[in-house]
UniProtKB/Swiss-Prot annotation:
This is Cytochrome b. A ubiquinone binds at H202. The gene is mt:Cyt-b. Belongs to the cytochrome b family. Coiled coil: none annotated. It comes from the Eukaryota. One of its GO terms (cellular component) is mitochondrial inner membrane.
Amino acid sequence: MHKPLRNSHPLFKIANNALVDLPAPINISSWWNFGSLLGLCLIIQILTGLFLAMHYTADVNLAFYSVNHICRDVNYGWLLRTLHANGASFFFICIYLHIGRGIYYGSYLFTPTWLVGVIILFLVMGTAFMGYVLPWGQMSFWGATVITNLLSAIPYLGMDLVQWLWGGFAVDNATLTRFFTFHFILPFIVLAMTMIHLLFLHQTGSNNPIGLNSNIDKIPFHPYFTFKDIVGFIVMIFILISLVLISPNLLGDPDNFIPANPLVTPAHIQPEWYFLFAYAILRSIPNKLGGVIALVLSIAILMILPFYNLSKFRGIQFYPINQILFWSMLVTVILLTWIGARPVEEPYVLIGQILTIIYFLYYLINPLVTKWWDNLLN
């Protein structure tokens, strides 16, 4: 009997098993759209970034003006740049919603998939940080100086590491050149890690909103979820294009319109909005090394979730108290984002410290409350 090409060709077969004939749970909601939206974001970022790299110059004397040149003189350069800058914001919105979904519905119990996902998050954060340095504005330069300088907190090796990273005794041309190189290569590493993420996911199949085994009731991915994903694509692209065409600099920092000047420090150094919660956690620890450890742990703590699960049911859909804790944690992250953009003075410092404690306590208390609730039901 004649088989369709998608089932017989060795290359198409891989794509077919991942995107067409993949058995998917019948009841997955729109919260499961964010994986494909992240794939779309990554493609948008790689394509716009590729064209931007054709016109960008990684030199301290020319970088700022090359970005200016892209926006003024290159055909649709303004569109490429604003799509790329705001695309990063949408990437992080989707990634945070994707992680939130994973925490809520217990998707972290797919341990290898979850751990690869956290590694992808670290890589994406590194990529975004280095991309923010490239326009070589005031906030680019001082952000790079402050964040890379955190490595000096590492005992014994610190200063050597910082100078090795900088390529000199300060953030300068060597730093900009290597950041551009890494910013170019990392998205392709993220792409490779995404393939591994999907490979692990397809070993187990997707989770679903009730957290039960759905093998008895699955449907093919195409056409059902391809069309559902396309609806998500259209909504996200519409919002992204609206932002880009109406208010492209809304999420940026005005200080970055000033060329980098090592002799003038901005009044308030802060990263892009999607890093502010982690920046607030960093600042809330009055010790440099402690702050760096807290900064890394604020993301790395996600890795403990698969190993610290005490509940009988998957996810927190059936745990009312845990739902209150979860939404409280979400509010905590939003408030930390707000604190990260505030100056280092009272009462912001104290609020940041309290919120940091609440943030970390969530990961420790949540499994204990599920255990208590299970015991209550026995």
